[in-house]
């Protein structure tokens, strides 16, 4: 899943806000394999959780929560109002392990590709919890 900033770039403290929003419902509403918050966009490799009662969390609801919370906090810090994120987002169903590895590696190496760090593990806004969904 990818979503983009409406305009400009996120300051470092704003990227922490977004990453915290992503982490907040990990294991409760979705399982994150990898998340990266870039200056102007976010990539997530996640799987929605299905509860014991059969309730699953839709991608649109998951995204609404992440974007809504982070936008409110970013606007509060900027003393601004209005949209932080573009309305559009892009998602894709990962159909096999090869595609999973491709997406995971793309997310991991996005900061190095954009020359924000030398190695993926050096980028403060890359999160890979290292857990598998139950």
Identify the meaning behind each predicted range:
Residues 1-134:
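Short catalytic/metal-binding and nucleic-acid-binding patches
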